[in-house]
A protein has these predicted regions:
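N-terminal helical cap/lid subdomain that shapes the substrate entry/recognition surface
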Residues: 126-213
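Asp-based, Mg2+/Mn2+-dependent phosphohydrolase catalytic module
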Residues: 127, 217-220, 233, 238-337
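Conserved N-terminal beta-strand and adjoining loop/helix that marks the start
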Residues: 1-16
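Non-catalytic pre-domain segments flanking phosphatase-related domains
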Residues: 118-131, 336-337
Length: 337
């Protein structure tokens, strides 16, 4: 089996060297931890020293193997190293010195992605989890869509469930506005009728997202704190209580706190001020771009929990297709340098 040494090279200020693969190479234009193939008889450290001298004219002092990963039939030894010298580009098209957390801004080669993530999410470890409600914690959309349809029918509109769902994935207000304008309806009346229909949705009609209850409990047991950040009213707490999840939350904000709606950062900033949360230890998790944008604008990490499969291009630092995928990211074994 082919074996490769990849260098986690750190300089005195704590920043780590990453390099961008050049045109014509496999995984061109993606970032990597520099290194190369081990030759017969070489140790991982010896290989790394040779490769970094050849590729970057960079002398290093090597240390321990941080971890070994197998990707596509190749073993990658990630070797810790230190340097006080300046690298020179010879094969790569770019390089950067970054903090572990800054690695989340870069797209890495498949072999390097997990290692970069394990370092980035523990610099420092995440402790505070801010949750959207509708479509994130609870699968409320089927009931909400039917509430919109019933409200629209009072004005003679007959939107399809598919169209309402598509519009709601942007924002409820956007959905109501689009339906009213497109059908000559009264927007404010439609919104008011929807709210009345929504208020009548019984808790037993709302399901927890698959594996979400276990995820909340696991993060809590690992020392995490949960906070609600939702456009829904105080009934969100009632639904959480019904599902036995209310006690897992330290607090949060709802529509009834009368703060500007996401993607404005105000709701998140209010929670952070109220509970004294550190931005570097906080992440906003939601299922729509307005949630992740609110997180970015508030200066915290964001995770797109895209169970609908609609937002794969969202610029959130983390992307998960389902709750299990999300937990694989949030609970990955930390890589300590």
């Amino acid at each position: 089996m082919i074996r490769v040494s990849a260098g986690v090279v750190r300089r005195a200020d704590g920043k780590i060297l990453i390099c961008k693969r050049g045109e014509g190479r496999k995984n061109a234009h993606l970032w990597e931890f520099p290194g190369g193939k081990q030759e017969s008889g070489e140790t991982p450290a010896e290989c790394l020293k040779r490769e970094l001298q050849e590729e970057l004219l960079l002398p290093v002092q090597t240390g321990r193997i941080l971890c070994t990963e197998e990707k596509q039939g190749i073993l990658f030894d990630f070797v810790y190293a230190e340097t006080a010298e300046k690298p020179t580009l010879t094969e790569h098209e770019a390089m950067a010195w970054v903090t572990p957390r800054e690695m989340l801004r870069y797209t890495f080669c498949p072999a390097d992605t997990d290692v970069a993530m394990r370092m980035a999410l523990n610099d420092p470890p995440l402790k505070n989890f801010l949750w959207d409600f509708d479509g994130t914690l609870m699968n409320t959309y089927p009931a909400m869509v039917q509430a919109v349809i019933r409200a629209a029918e009072k004005q003679g509109m007959h939107p399809s469930a598919e169209n309402v769902t598509r519009l709601m994935m942007h924002d409820l207000r956007h959905c109501v506005h689009t339906l009213a304008v497109g059908n000559g309806g009264d927007e404010e009346q439609l919104y008011a009728d929807y709210r009345r229909e929504e208020a009548g949705i019984p808790p037993e009609d709302i399901d927890v997202m698959p594996h979400m209850a276990e995820a909340l409990q696991t993060l809590k047991e690992r020392g995490g704190r949960h906070f609600l950040v939702t456009h829904r009213g105080e009934d969100a707490w009632r639904y959480l209580e019904y599902q036995g999840l209310r006690a897992l939350f330290d607090g949060g904000v709802t529509r009834d706190d009368h703060l500007p709606r996401k993607p404005a950062p105000d709701m998140i900033l209010h929670v952070m001020r109220t509970f004294g949360l550190c931005p570097e230890e906080t992440i906003m998790i939601g299922d729509r771009p307005l949630d992740t944008e609110a997180g970015r604008r508030a200066g915290v990490l964001s995770c797109m929990l895209d169970t609908s499969g609609r937002f794969a291009e969202d610029p959130a630092e983390l992307y998960a297709k389902d709750v299990e995928n999300m937990m694989g990211l949030l609970c990955a074994e930390p890589l300590i340098l």
